[in-house]
């Protein structure tokens, strides 16, 4: 029996006994969620690709749900891989395009493969959704999609005001943003197990854009595990948007096999709290215009 199956049985048992816990049964072991932060460039605009700041904030938000135990890993990969033991889900908020530390060594790939086979949830955020072509097989198997030479990326404005009936969408309110997106991904054959959640392109931000515009999705994997991916979150300021914030927290908890409350998972945060997690940076020197 994999981790997802055990967690599902815990929830069913709690429901049958009338235990009032929306996420996990009171008294059960907490759901361990490992947050892997990509290394943050020291010289860069404050908030840009602040993977560590984002993971620290996500840990604080996840703690608002009873029975959840977030564990933070800094700088790409843990010094001791034992941190993954017993994890209900693993979150990667890192650079992509082959820069992922989890893909840099056969042993690390095997470690993630083992977690996936055991039914652990997997969440990929922002550039972490972009595996290099050499790892397209893993990308499809783990997340249900792959970034290809035909895929696209860029910054543009988009509005998001309607969401499908899925647990990850619970309590998600509309938002508008100029974000850095990756879209035009290649999905598994027949979109089997895929549920699109958010769409974005330079010309729109809704379902009419179809498969090419998908930027957030869930994947019910054939092994019984769950994956959630979202290609936004280029800048730390995006966390100020409650709708986006709840989508991500819901997605992580859902990937861990947890039931999402009807109003969505709690994710209260004001600007002061969000900014308190910013990683100190040295701004890059101003660009000098050529004469």
Language-model regions, residue ranges each:
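A glycine-rich, often tryptophan-bearing local segment used as a flexible ligand/cofactor-contacting loop or short
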Residues: 97-174
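Extracellular ligand-binding/catalytic regions of CAZymes and related secreted enzymes
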Residues: 28-31, 37, 57, 64, ...
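Active-site rim elements
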Residues: 45-46, 126, 153-155, 173, ...
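Catalytic beta-strand/loop cores that center a nucleophilic Ser/Cys/Thr
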Residues: 63, 145-224
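Bacterial N-terminal signal peptides
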Residues: 10-22
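Helical hinge/lid and interdomain linker segments adjacent to catalytic or ligand-binding clefts
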Residues: 4, 32-36, 43-131
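Sec/Tat signal peptide C-region and signal peptidase I cleavage site
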Residues: 23-27
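Positively charged n-region of N-terminal signal peptides that target proteins for export
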Residues: 1-7
């Amino acid at each position: 029996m994999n981790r997802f199956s055990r967690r599902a049985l815990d929830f069913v048992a709690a429901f049958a006994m009338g235990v009032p816990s929306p996420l996990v049964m009171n008294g059960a072991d907490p759901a361990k969620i490992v947050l892997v932060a990509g290394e943050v460039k020291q010289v860069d605009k404050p908030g840009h690709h602040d993977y560590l700041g984002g993971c620290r904030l996500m840990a604080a938000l996840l703690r608002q749900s009873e029975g959840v135990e977030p564990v933070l890993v800094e700088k790409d990969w843990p010094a001791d891989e034992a941190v993954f033991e017993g994890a209900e889900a693993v979150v990667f908020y890192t650079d992509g395009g082959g820069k992922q530390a989890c893909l840099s060594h056969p042993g690390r790939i095997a470690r993630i493969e083992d977690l996936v086979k055991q039914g652990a949830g997997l969440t990929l955020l922002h550039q972490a959704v972009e595996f290099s072509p050499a790892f397209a097989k893993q990308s499809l198997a783990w997340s249900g999609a792959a970034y290809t030479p035909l895929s696209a990326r860029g910054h543009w404005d988009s509005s998001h005001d309607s969401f499908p009936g899925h647990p990850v969408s619970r309590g998600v309110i509309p938002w508008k943003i100029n974000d850095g997106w990756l879209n035009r991904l290649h999905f598994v054959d027949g979109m089997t197990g895929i549920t699109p959640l958010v769409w974005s392109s330079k010309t729109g931000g809704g379902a009419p854009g179809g498969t090419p515009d998908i930027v957030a999705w869930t994947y019910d994997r054939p092994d019984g595990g769950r994956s959630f991916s979202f290609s936004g979150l280029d800048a730390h300021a995006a966390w100020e948007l409650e709708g986006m914030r709840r989508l991500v927290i819901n997605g992580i908890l859902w990937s861990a096999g947890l039931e999402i409350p009807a109003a969505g998972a709690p994710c209260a945060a004001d600007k002061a709290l969000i900014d308190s997690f910013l990683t100190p940076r040295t701004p890059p020197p101003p660009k000098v215009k050529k004469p």
